[in-house]
Amino acid sequence: MIASVRGEVLEVALDHAVIEAAGVGYRVNATPSTLSTLRTGTQARLITAMIVREDSMTLYGFTDAETRDLFLTLLSVSGVGPRLAMATLAVHDAGALRQALHDGDVAALTRVPGIGKRGAERMVLELRDKIGAAGAAGAPAGAARNGHAVRGPVVEALVGLGFAAKQAEEATDKVLAAEPEAGTSGALRAALSLLGKSR
């Protein structure tokens, strides 16, 4: 899986950028706020999520791992694909989105093109317990930092291996709840084992 891309920015368009890394130009889809930080001809690094489908492999880029993880979490919601997840993050930054989900703010969520009242309510229902409010207290600091660092790459790897985003999220959350200090490789092995038993 491609977890990040670093290199020269060759092109910045309305919905994507092209970044050259080791002689290869990667097209990375991104939100306007992320694209606004890039300048053609300069060096840049984006945290990425690679979504693999039967007929495509698409990179989505973010300025930080928290936003990337939130993107992957949005994909676990029924009816939310990569385009709608990116549209959501284009309208709301990570902190505002967490707060809206925590507060059940349907009005804020329906400001996203493509999300109606029912879709917003489903988002709140499915994600409120998964996503805490911005700055909310939760697990001990060390465990929280570790879970944050491990969760995104594990979920991304599982999605890349063909598991549904929701399955990947649930399996990873179970593993990290049982083993908060697990490393990325250990958590991935445990999640694969868990998913293998459920098949």
From Swiss-Prot:
Q: Mention one GO molecular function.
A: four-way junction helicase activity
Keywords carried by this UniProt record: Cytoplasm, DNA damage, DNA recombination, DNA repair, DNA-binding
Residue ranges of the region described as Domain II: 64-142
Q: Does the keyword Secreted apply?
A: no
The terms describing its cellular component in GO are: cytoplasm; Holliday junction helicase complex; Holliday junction resolvase complex
Task: Supply the InterPro entries for this chain.
Answer: DNA_helicase_Holl-junc_RuvA_I (IPR013849), NA-bd_OB-fold (IPR012340), RuvA (IPR000085), RuvA_2-like (IPR010994), RuvA_C (IPR011114), RuvA_C_sf (IPR036267)
Where's it found, cell-wise? Cytoplasm
Location of the region described as Domain I in the Swiss-Prot/TrEMBL record: 1-63
Q: Where is the signal peptide?
A: none
* Chain intervals for the UniProt region annotation (Domain III): 153-199
* Single GO BP term: DNA recombination
Q: Residue ranges of region Flexible linker? A: 143-153
What does this gene product do?
The RuvA-RuvB-RuvC complex processes Holliday junction (HJ) DNA during genetic recombination and DNA repair, while the RuvA-RuvB complex plays an important role in the rescue of blocked DNA replication forks via replication fork reversal (RFR). RuvA specifically binds to HJ cruciform DNA, conferring on it an open structure. The RuvB hexamer acts as an ATP-dependent pump, pulling dsDNA into and through the RuvAB complex. HJ branch migration allows RuvC to scan DNA until it finds its consensus sequence, where it cleaves and resolves the cruciform DNA.
Q: Whom does it interact with, and what assembly results?
A: Homotetramer. Forms an RuvA(8)-RuvB(12)-Holliday junction (HJ) complex. HJ DNA is sandwiched between 2 RuvA tetramers; dsDNA enters through RuvA and exits via RuvB. An RuvB hexamer assembles on each DNA strand where it exits the tetramer. Each RuvB hexamer is contacted by two RuvA subunits (via domain III) on 2 adjacent RuvB subunits; this complex drives branch migration. In the full resolvosome a probable DNA-RuvA(4)-RuvB(12)-RuvC(2) complex forms which resolves the HJ.
What UniProt notes about the protein's domains is: Has three domains with a flexible linker between the domains II and III and assumes an 'L' shape. Domain III is highly mobile and contacts RuvB.
What the record says about family reads: Belongs to the RuvA family.
| Protein name, as recorded | Holliday junction branch migration complex subunit RuvA
